[in-house]
Amino acid sequence: MRVKGIQRNWQHLWKWGTLILGLVIICSASDNLWVTVYYGVPVWEDADTPLFCASDAKSYSSEKHNVWATHACVPTDPNPQEIAIENVTENFNMWKNNMVEQMQEDIISLWEESLKPCVKLTPLCITLNCTNVNSANHTEANNTVENKEEIKNCSFKITTERGGKKKEEYALFYKLDVVPISNGNKTSYRLIHCNVSTIKQACPKVNFDPIPIHYCAPAGFAILKCRDKEYNGTGPCKNVSTVQCTHGIKPVVSTQLLLNGSLAEEDIRIRSENFTDNTKVIIVQLNNSIEINCIRPNNNTRKSIPIGPGQAFYATGDIIGDIRQAHCNVSRIKWREMLKNVTAQLRKIYNNKNITFNSSAGGDLEITTHSFNCRGEFFYCNTSGLFNNNISNINNETITLPCKIKQIVRMWQKVGQAMYALPIAGNLVCKSNITGLILTRDGGNNNDSTEETFRPGGGDMRDNWRSELYKYKTVKIKSLGVAPTRARRRVVEREKRAVGLGAVFLGFLGAAGSTMGAASITLTAQVRQLLSGIVQQQSNLLRAIEAQQHLLQLTVWGIKQLQSRVLAIERYLKDQQLLGIWGCSGKLICTTNVPWNTSWSNKSYNEIWDNMTWLEWEREIHNYTQHIYSLIEESQNQQEKNEQDLLALDKWASLWNWFDISNWLWYIRIFIMIVGGLIGLRIVFAVLSIVNRVRQGYSPLSFQTLTHHQREPDRLGKTEEGGGEQDRDRSTRLVSGFLALAWDDLRSLCLFSYHRLRDLVLIAARTVELLGRSSLKGLRLGWEGLKYLWNLLLYWGRELKNSAINLLDTIAIATANGTDRVIEVAQRAYRAILNVPTRIRQGLERALL
């Protein structure tokens, strides 16, 4: 059997392989990514920044909140905006919120300004003779002994303004404001806190009625709001929006009960930093408010007692009518229903344990009672009737909380400071809404207990503000973003325009949940929504400020507002400075020459632009941002240097500039310098020639006329270096006149220059010719070497191909021959086996024959 080898066309394989290799190289080159700068991306990060307040304060009102807000806050925005951010999850933490700390400082400022101490009551830190108040003009059938003892009528001696004489005065004090002196005399008292601090009297005409205050973020920052209805105060929030200012928050200072706050939208919400830690307070936000009415029924009068030059002590002069105790009324039905709902929510948190409520366990009066300020008077109400498990067994429709009033109070904002609050004349009535509770849980080591006891708490006013600011956080807008693209900067033109003053803000944050590709398309529209004037986000607010400038005074808060404006401008200038350094001024999308390094992010191009948001991308490359910025700056510096070198070559780009009149002046100067130099050389050579002739015996001052003499053929003309020349006559042109002499010298100089330049050009041409021949010879030899190597490569390739073909042929032939022999042997064996019966039959036939 014969097998023929099949030859393949290796030349076609070489062509296809080269083509495929080229395509691979082109495709790999096309996947190169370059850093691109984007201005106006919806990216932010957590930040603490000074906020400014806004309120609808009435400048004509003497109420302290209005007075403070007029000086401290700007008018509210008539068109507040709230823009939902889709597909964004943001972490909030109400327990670590700088907005709470700022509000704490602001309300302390409000109280210190409202209750500014004017008069030291040191002259009253004396022994007071006090008795229970007896009303002689009115019946006391309805007055209990406790009510009588609640107010003391105290007499004391005071120094008059003139003559230093002593005068006896009297004033009414609440029982809580005086303490008995332990000397056995039951009528001797002194003012409380006299022995531990200096008591100061607040300025007169203090009136309290909290007004809503809005907190606003300055330009370059934003306030994010969590709108999840089941948000518990910490953790991720999926329903996020951005707002210019918070809702109006009434700064009500109270304990145990939260008054006039915001309500939960659906069920009652219970929040705590750690429910298993009994030292952490529990804030309850109600979904329905409960009205609480507080009354001081006594119609008090106020009297003024002079205690020094220009100083007066204001005290309660008399009580008209019955002496009845101050109290607060709460609807029993609503309170009972609210406690039932709170109990149900607490059972979910504490694994269906029995929930009980009890009164405060003890402590300062401000903690053990519901303390608050009612139009300038400080109420301390006993809430044991509210937090009582037997409340459902009582059928009265109203829960009455007995209250006490103090005029010498300890300031909640500072430790160890006491103040005398002036008495308020007339009846006092305060109507408020209970919108939340502050609870504490009893501790213990028995974790297997089936019962949890909760008591009213409070005292730290930060918890009051936290109950309103739990859904807000401040963030800093990062308007610059970098991302990889396939575009590379080719030519950088000098930009002379700039984008209007802008910082990424509010309006465009709605695109934060979009993919990077979708968000980058709308950058122009986003930037147009940024700022107008100083801050576009606050354009309406600024117009309101301009309309009411007469309301604003440059106080501490005025300076704070100016700082916010300066901060906005600084942030804008910083962004513009970076854009300018990178060569991106006036551009929203700016390509660079910096190649993208996969070590920064190994995600593919499509994965980045089609699946990721700008927020996710910023977190991905956060650790490399500054390094990328520095690389962009270095690349721009190198590009500017290259541009400078290129501009230096641009002077040769236009030959017509050579004929400019300003250039001709330079040409004339250069020509004069060259001619002067040549004349100087001519003079030097002339002097040297004269010296040479003098050495030969000629006289330079001779007046002889040179005549021509015919020499004999056998005589030499000269005896020195000129000797040996035959049949050559020398003559010297005789010229007369300055012009002729100048022309002769100039002609000789030009001829001399021409001859020298001609020689130089010939030498240069010869040199170039030799170099060209050498170069051509080298190139020819190199080309021949390359052709030789190529032919050698083709020869060995052909030999290898032939050897391979011969090898395949030999193997095929050998295999075929071997196969034929094997087949032949097998056939013989098969035929032999088939012939066995025949051979046996033939043998038997022979045997029989």
From Swiss-Prot:
> Which top-level group of life is the source organism from?
Viruses
Cleavage, annotated site positions: 497-498
Entry's Pfam families? GP120, GP41
Q: Where is this motif: YXXL motif?
A: 698-701
The regions listed as transmembrane in this protein's record are: 671-691
In residue numbers, the region (V3) covers: 294-327
Which residue ranges does the record annotate as region V2? 154-194
Q: Where is this region: V1?
A: 130-153
Return the annotated region ranges for MPER. 648-669
The cysteines covalently paired via disulfide bonds are 53-73, 118-203, 125-194, 130-154, 216-245, 226-237, 294-328, 374-430, 381-403, 584-590
Glycosylation sites noted in the Swiss-Prot or TrEMBL record = 87, 129, 137, 142, 153, 185, 195, 232, 239, 260, 274, 287, 299, 329, 341, 354, 358, 382, 390, 396, 433, 447, 597, 602, 611, 623
What more the UniProt record tells us is: Inhibitors targeting HIV-1 viral envelope proteins are used as antiretroviral drugs. Attachment of virions to the cell surface via non-specific interactions and CD4 binding can be blocked by inhibitors that include cyanovirin-N, cyclotriazadisulfonamide analogs, PRO 2000, TNX 355 and PRO 542. In addition, BMS 806 can block CD4-induced conformational changes. Env interactions with the coreceptor molecules can be targeted by CCR5 antagonists including SCH-D, maraviroc (UK 427857) and aplaviroc (GW 873140), and the CXCR4 antagonist AMD 070.
What protein name does the entry list?
Envelope glycoprotein gp160
Protein species of origin: Human immunodeficiency virus type 1 group M subtype G (isolate 92NG083) (HIV-1)
What is the primary gene name for this protein?
Answer: env
